[in-house]
Every structure is written in structure tokens, then in C-alpha cells.
Amino acid sequence: MRVSFKRFLTESGRFAEILQYGCGKHERELLPIGSVRKTGAFRTVGKKSALNQHSRRPDTVPLVYQSRSWNNGVFIGSITGSETTAAAAGAVGVVRRDPMAMLPFCGYNMGDYWQHWLEMGKKLGDKAPKIFNVNWFRTDDEGHFIWPGFGDNLRVLEWILKRCDNEVDAVETAIGYVPKPEDINLEGLKDFDKEKLASILKVDNAKWAKEAAGVEEFYKKFGDKLPQELRDELNGLEERTKA
């Protein structure tokens, strides 16, 4: 049944499009579907473009969501991180922020780096790609991963492409736009249904209010280097979680 889903993507032309988001330097060999244009940190195929942020969180962050705007997407990237586990040094369950997975590699102040992204959005205007965040690592009460992951991540990437084409609606939440469970193809998945999917798409405002408090502490490290736009986004998140 897994092959059936892959065949569906292939026949619809979406499998090649999805490969675009993970094929790196091999994109020209893998994608004989037209010219590929590289612009900054993202690639476009035809009229489609998307940026994908990644989180590794056992709860709070949904399986996938779309940012509310370019600035909101930069904000999402600035607060990404993972929770410490028993295998990691330090306290368990503490969120370690790694903005845009660049903290160990950025050779200058992260505040300036974020400002660069914000300026890039201004230059791109309505040509800016849509920004998404994925979190494959939601767990149940026993610590088991809920989403099957691996090749089934294509199902989520297909939804992202559909959003880029305005083919599906989404549910507005305090953090952005999440899928309707029926809009993610679950064909062939065993022991996984729309109820499980709904559980990892849920946005808990109380947890996000706590998250916002943690971001507030994190942002203090950057002092006057923190762009005002990100401060505004944090304030907006705090207000929306109270609604």
C-alpha cells in the first residue's frame, strides 16, 4: 500500500516536486520537469516555492504548520529547537534553542542574521516563498513517536505543495495555519488514523503561552540586536494565546 501512495504522487507529478525539497545538489538529475532557479536560501520549481523549518519536540509543536507571514516565518525559525533527553547532558525536558539550525555556524550576531532575513523578505515582496515548520517527533505518553516518519513524510510535503498551489484550506491557530486532518493523505497507513493525526496537529494555547515565556528569556540574550519585527511577532503570539 505504501507503493500505491508513491505511485499516486508520481502519476500526479507531485513526487518529482517533493523530491525537489530534499535532493540538494542532485536536483537536476532528479527533476527533469523544467528549469530550476536558485534564489538565496530557497529553490523554486515553476510557480511553487517553500521554505521548511524543522523542530524536534515531543509535544507543543504540531506536525506541520504554515507561518502567518514572512516575518512570522522568520520568527518561527528564530525560536526553533529541541528538548533535552536522558541521553543529553543537563536537565531533561529543557528546550535548547537553535535558531534556523545555525547557532553553531553563524559567524556573527544572530540578531543581525535575523535582520538579514527580514530585509530579504522586504526585497522579495509578494514573490517570497511560503514558510512552514515540520515536527516529525511528537510522542505519546509512553515516549513512542506518533507519526510514522521516513518515507511517509512525503504525505506532509504533499500538503505543503498543495498549500503553495492554494489547493487546500487550513485552520488558523495562534501560531499559524495547520492542516485539516482530511487534507493529509493517509492511504495505506496501518494503525494510524485521522484521530491520531488530529492529536499531533492540535495547538494548545496554554503550552504556547509557556513557550512564549521561554522565548522571552531567550531573546533577552540579544539585547538591542533583536529586531523589532521579532519582538512584535512575540507580542502577537502572546496576545493570540490569551484568546
Which sequence ranges carry the predicted segments?
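Conserved NTP phosphate-binding and transfer environment spanning the P-loop NTPase/kinase superfamily
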Residues: 1-243
